Structures are given as structure tokens and as C-alpha cells.
Amino acid sequence: MKVGVTIFLTDESARAEEVAKLAELYEFESLWLPDHTHIPSLRKSQHPLFKDEIPREYLRMLDVFVALTMAAAATKRLAIGTGICVLSQRDPIVTAKAVASLDFVSNGRFLFGVGAGWNLEEVANHGIDPNDRFKVLVERIEAMQAIWTQDVASYSGHFVSFEEIWSWPKPLQSPHPPILLGANGPRAVERAVKLGAHWLPGYHKDDNYLISRILEYRKCTEDQLGVTLSMPPLDRSRLARLADAGVDRAFFLLPTAKIDEVEQRIDEIRHITADL
């Protein structure tokens, strides 16, 4: 199992380059950063993990592509990923350029985790009907794939449409960086399979249920695509069982704190996950 870390980087936390250098020093495979453009102060949407007040770091996080660029510049081997990019609320032409540029400057180390978003008010503030957010996500992925793989790209959909365009650079990875669908709902496996995407589920407290979904996904994809698990428990025996079921990567949450506290957690994670 490949092992990575994730962190909410803010204007109050350790810097992106500090965390990235530590992650590489401790021989983690990847660093993942989350994405929110903003958090509406008036909202009805509940976070999947926090029923009450949203943690402070959600309000103050850095732009994911800027922070990942800093991480890439500070490292040589570490894979860098969005965990996840809320693509339903990002312009596909602009985001295609950002992804291709980041993959290019990182020498092909970028992993593109995407999702439709849980915060319905946040999505709505970008002019998207929250009920359409997954349909929008699908069209934006398809449009971006066209931009990445065609010298002269065009796309015609219900939510995304543009005439022939030029856009360089192309991603360094061929045909483009791996796309991982971040989703946990009843249709998550079906949607990942339909998109031809790797699956990036959040951890589910019921190991047996999660394993059954992983096996379902693996059967549908004939092991051609991977499963990356977001923020599972730091329990070696449970991680080994999940690895046996088909999880080939997991990443663990670091505290939004200064670098000394971050390093303490990195050391703990490295110790428990060694040789998985």
C-alpha cells in the first residue's frame, strides 16, 4: 500500500513547502490538499464528519493549486494531489490549464482527485444548481480531457460548451494525470466506473461495508484502476485488511499546526504504516 498525508494548509499553519519537504524526507508517496473556494456563513448543508460548527481551517485554507505548486517546487519525488478539487464549481478551461501546468512543472507528479462537493450553498454561489452538480462534474471532466489530449479541442454539452480552442502546455503524463473520483454515496462505485476513474472514497467506519464496495469496484474495473482511501484510522491491522481487499493507497490527516507539531504526527504515521 502506498502511503500519503493530507493537511488543511492555512495562513496560520505550517507552510506548503515545509510540509512537502518533511513528507518527502519521511518517504511518503504523496501529499494531498483539499479544496474549498469559500465557506458560506449561512448554510444548511452538513459536513459528512462535523454536524455542528465547521472547523476553523475550512474557513482559511489556501488555494489548492497555488499551495500544490509550492509543494512541487520544494520536492523532487513526492506525488502531489488534490484531495479533492471541487470541480463542479471550477471553470473547466481555466482548471485544465492549471492541471496541465502543475503536471508539467512537477515533472509528471500530479494526481487529480475530483468531486462534486458536499456544501450545496458553496456550489450554488458559483452559479451551479446543486442538484446538477454531478452532471456538471462529468461534463467538466470530459471537456478537460478533450483540452488535454487534442491540439484543437472543442466540447458541446448541456453545461459546458466551447468552440475549437488551443491550450498548452499539455500534461506531462499521458494521456493526462490520473483522475480519482472522490465519492461515498450509494452510486459512488457506479459513477467511478462510468467515468473510468480511480476511486477515492472517504473512510467508512464499517470496515465490512467498505470492503464490499471496494470488491464491487475492483470487479467492475478488473483491477485496471486503483482505490485510494482518504483518512482511514491509524490502525495497522485494519489497514492491512483494507490493503488485502484492494486499497492500494491511503492518506492520513496531519494537524493544521506549525511544523513541529506536524512533524510529530508525520513520525507517528510513518512508524505505524512502515512496510504495509
Regions found by a protein language model. Name each.
Residues 1-276:
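Active-site-adjacent structural elements that line small-molecule/cofactor binding pockets in enzymes
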